[in-house]
Amino acid sequence: NEFRLSSKTKADEEAIHVFAENLRQLLLASPLGSKKVLALDPGYRTGCKLVCLDAQGNLVYNTAIYPHPPQNEWQASVATIKQLVAKYDIEAIGVGNGTAGRETETLVRSIDFGKTVNIFQVNESGASIYSASEVAREEFPDQDVTVRGAVSIGRRLLDPLSELVKIDPKSIGVGQYQHDVNQVKLKSALDRVVESAVNFVGVDVNTASKHLLQYVSGISSTLAGNIVAYRTQNGPFKSRDELKKVSLMGPKTFEQCAGFLRIPGAANPLDNSSVHPERYSLVEQMAADVQATLEDLIKKAELRKQINKRKYITETVGEFTIEDILKELEKPGRDPRAQIEEFRFDETIKSIEDVKVGMTVPGIVTNITAFGAFVDIGVKQDGLVHVSQLSNKYVSDPNEVVKLNQKVQVTVTEVDVARKRIGLTMKTAGGNERTVGAGGERKERDNRPAKNFNKKPEPLNAFQSKLMDLKKKFND
């Protein structure tokens, strides 16, 4: 029992670690930013729900189109999309990656808009959970679940972090065995990841929802609601100092949260940076010492190079703090997340029947587990790159090689249409390691002493004997 408990605890810790790391990567996925978007939640019989959002993610229009069987209103759908892109000055289109996603993407890509409109596939896992949630009902009391789901897809494209915090992380589908692990420990770990991601990126206090604000360090759910209520009543915050007027925003809370709240366009440019208000006087002193204004210090790298870091080190301000401040002054308020890139699947692949062994195709990493990575290559079933196939070198942790939403090139090694399984490899040609189906160990391990296969096996205890019986059952 002790051994079983120890094994379960270790397995739980590993599963929680995998889920937490995947969630962190998903939350920090590349945002499109403030752009007007058209989002499509694809479907066949029930049609594709279509919404237009403004640059802040507000719903401005919704309708449905029926380009696929049984209605097959392809040309009418093309005309509707083209008209809406022109009417609402749409800059990008997001297509959900669920049922009929590829066909809908093909439809959108066939349209000549007469201008550049970037098209993205958006992971819609959990969108249906959001659309039926209390949060969604509160945001869109007069819309049905299909409209809410399409809005969620569009907002995920604009800013994945702001939208995904509204969904229970367990519904996003990026873990392994998450329903079998200790749920209290899992929730605690995931909450820490969300809070860490939100604080890492920072939050625009004038546009953030209360669901996002409550993950900022020091801000409770009640205070988040008070911030939104104050903003609604008094208009946008003009400075970080104004936050002190919000009910329940005490000095200690302000000290905890101020550095993570951004105010774009504030009179003091530091209000849109990660520099904490208690360090403003230090930055102002730096500017004065090089005979420059705060704005000049931010704009001109040559002025920042003149700063003698050691001069500002005190008991409470270390060298690392000074370096962090100077780094932030290079690009105040910069988003630390990577820039979004447009991606296309192989146009010749529409279903698993089109996938052939030996094909090299582009794909997107959709899930990472301890045993490998799942990759979407544009068919309904994701393919698996086993951990042994991720690299020509030995890999102990798949996260060392791939990240969620990463664009990768994969080669098909196995296709089982009946069981809907696709085996993939990311190994490059010329590697010394074995490919799927070949024998032998990895070269890195060849220097280990050879096993003596003539040696008599050690006697089994009762537990080992049962374990061996189980293994035989699964292998037979």
Name these PLM-found stretches:
Residues 57-90, 94:
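Nucleic-acid-processing active sites and adjacent nucleic-acid-binding tracks
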Residues 37-39, 49, 105-107, 239-242, ...:
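Short beta-alpha junctions and helix-cap segments that line functional grooves
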Residues 61-74, 144-145, 387-398:
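Flexible beta-alpha connector loops of hexameric P-loop NTPases
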Residues 261-476:
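Single-stranded RNA-binding regions, centering on S1/OB-family and related RNA-binding modules
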Residues 129, 138-236, 251, 255-282, ...:
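Long, highly charged, low-complexity intrinsically disordered interaction regions
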Residues 31-59, 250:
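Gly/Thr-rich phosphate-binding beta-strand-loop-beta motif of the actin/hexokinase/Hsp70
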Residues 1-36, 55, 78-83:
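Extended, highly charged clamp/arch subdomains and adjacent linkers
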Residues 3, 91-100, 120:
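Short glycine-rich phosphate-binding loop at a beta-alpha junction
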